[in-house]
């Protein structure tokens, strides 16, 4: 949602992540970290220095590349395997990311809920609403 500016998707699904056990600090990191799609040293270093777990960092890199470049570098794919994901889990992650990318493109293109001109809710706002 963040990479595709899908305000509706963020505002609807970020609270579900919090309810599912994602910590507010982790959600904030995902919202504010620069994209690592191009594997730039600065961006990757920012991710490495974040409070996210190793698995979360690998998922962020994979998601960034899938969302913005479509093709995923072998090294980024290997990070998921290093973090212990099975082939099945990688396929499930891939289809989940692809599904959200499809939905976000429809939501933004059609301005569903007339959200394009709005800001994404802050993590603090989301937590307060729970």
Named regions from a protein language model:
Residues 1-130:
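Hydrophobic alpha-helical segments
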């Amino acid at each position: 949602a963040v990479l595709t500016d899908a305000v509706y998707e963020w505002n609807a699904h970020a609270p579900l992540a919090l309810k599912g056990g994602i910590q507010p600090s982790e959600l904030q990191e995902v919202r504010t970290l620069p994209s690592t799609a191009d594997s730039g040293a600065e961006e990757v270093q920012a991710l490495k220095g974040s409070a996210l777990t190793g698995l979360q960092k690998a998922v962020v890199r994979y998601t960034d590349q899938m969302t913005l470049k479509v093709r995923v570098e072998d090294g980024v794919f290997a990070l998921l395997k290093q973090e212990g994901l099975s082939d099945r889990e990688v396929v499930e992650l891939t289809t989940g990311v692809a599904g959200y990318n499809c939905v976000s493109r429809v939501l933004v293109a059609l301005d569903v809920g007339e959200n394009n001109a709005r800001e994404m809710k802050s993590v603090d706002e989301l937590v307060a609403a729970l």
